């Protein structure tokens, strides 16, 4: 009976939030707050990918509904505790989770956060309604036979195991130290440079990711490094430590009037390969345009030479459609190519991919 009541109450709160334009504040006073909100995102996709085995164009629809429960409690000394949970209800029928964390600290000063969340974005891509690559992005699996567009995300967060972060602001200076602990063997697929990954003997990793950011009016710059401190956390079947990976990142943002511009650089020093990525994107009013370049250099018996990935993308947002506040229709497209200059011609497919998307988005 108690469970039924809780579910009914949650359904009532969600219904109330959707009836409002921008969520509902259940409690909001000097002692704390509790709110329910979320958003709906549905995509209608077209893709023409040379990597598709039968060569046919693809049409599909995907999306999800995110419900956010967030609350904070304050003290007279300026300290607080907070909690946030964001369950995802996917159009496939699966139920997933975005953020789920607990934090405490002092307002406008320091905070400690534990759970599941994302740390500072060191490779922002702007308005990316539809953005994919001929290869992998670094918050997905590292696939041995694909190019790797590294983006300083291997220790950013939202992993399946533990995560802890400390951050503090000193005026215009922001400091952050993020960590991820636990099994990170899911970063790799079955092989690394043609050799099978020994998933059965993986150890728990300990990844650290410090960030320093400084704001100068319209400009913000940030630098970061991420690395795994545990030796032999992930090895191949020959015993080679493939978890020995250190990444470096630098990003800058200019935000003035209707303009928002990001410039990004990321570099990964991994076992028998290096990965460098450069990104530039701009948002003017509701129009976004971006470009990402990735260069992989291999030096092993499996492959020697370079693989390069070029990706361009564009987006546009129609806001407040039908005069409904926070209801948007977004258009997005991307085009990506890969060029294999290694001595292993069969290792990397030179595929060109194109995609277009219409997105329906409503924030409640």
Identify the meaning behind each predicted range:
Residues 24-45, 56-184, 213-217:
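Outer membrane beta-barrel
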Residues 318, 352-364:
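Outer-membrane beta-barrel "beta-signal"
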Residues 203-205, 209-317:
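Detector for outer-membrane/organellar transmembrane beta-barrel domains
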Residues 38-46, 83-87, 116, 177-181, ...:
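Transmembrane beta-barrel strands of outer-membrane/channel proteins
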Residues 89-95, 122-126, 154-162, 183, ...:
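Solvent-exposed loop/turn segments connecting transmembrane beta-strands
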Residues 1-24:
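Gram-negative bacterial Sec-dependent N-terminal signal peptides
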Residues 78-81, 108-112, 172-177, 218-223, ...:
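Repeated loop/turn-to-beta-strand initiation elements of outer-membrane beta-barrel proteins
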Residues 32, 55-65, 95-100, 158-162, ...:
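Residues that define the transmembrane beta-barrel architecture of outer-membrane proteins
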């Amino acid at each position: 009976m108690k469970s039924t009541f809780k579910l009914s109450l949650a359904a009532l709160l969600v219904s109330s939030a959707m009836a409002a334009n921008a969520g509902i504040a259940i409690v909001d006073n000097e002692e704390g707050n509790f709110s329910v909100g979320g958003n709906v995102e549905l995509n209608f996709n077209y893709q023409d990918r040379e990597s598709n085995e039968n060569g046919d164009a693809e049409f599909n629809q995907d999306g999800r509904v995110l419900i956010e429960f967030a609350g904070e409690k304050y003290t007279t000394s300026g300290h607080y505790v907070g909690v946030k949970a964001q369950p995802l209800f996917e159009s496939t029928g699966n139920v997933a989770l975005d953020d789920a964390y607990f934090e405490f600290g002092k307002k406008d000063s320091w905070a400690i956060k534990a759970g599941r969340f994302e740390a500072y974005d060191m490779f922002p891509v702007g308005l990316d309604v539809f953005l994919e690559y001929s290869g992998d992005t670094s918050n997905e699996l590292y696939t041995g036979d694909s190019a790797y567009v590294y983006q300083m995300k291997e220790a950013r967060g939202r992993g399946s195991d533990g995560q802890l972060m400390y951050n503090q602001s000193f005026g215009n200076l922001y400091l952050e130290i993020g960590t991820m602990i636990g099994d990170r063997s899911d970063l790799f697929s079955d092989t690394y440079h043609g050799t099978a990954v020994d998933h059965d003997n993986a150890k728990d990793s300990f990844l650290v990711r410090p960030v320093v950011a400084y704001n100068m009016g319209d400009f913000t710059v940030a630098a970061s490094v991420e690395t795994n401190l545990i030796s032999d956390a992930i090895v191949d079947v020959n015993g080679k430590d493939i978890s020995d990976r250190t990444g470096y990142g630098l990003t800058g943002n200019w935000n003035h009037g209707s303009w928002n511009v990001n410039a990004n650089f990321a570099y990964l020093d991994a076992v028998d390969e290096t990965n460098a990525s450069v990104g530039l994107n701009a948002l003017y009013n509701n129009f976004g345009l971006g470009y990402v370049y990735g260069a992989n250099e291999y030096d092993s018996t499996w492959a020697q030479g370079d693989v390069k990935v070029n990706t361009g993308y564009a987006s546009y947002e129609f806001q407040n459609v039908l005069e409904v506040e926070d209801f948007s229709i977004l258009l997005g497209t991307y085009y990506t190519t890969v060029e294999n200059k290694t001595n292993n011609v069969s290792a990397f497919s030179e595929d060109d991919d194109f995609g277009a998307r219409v997105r329906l988005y409503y924030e409640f």
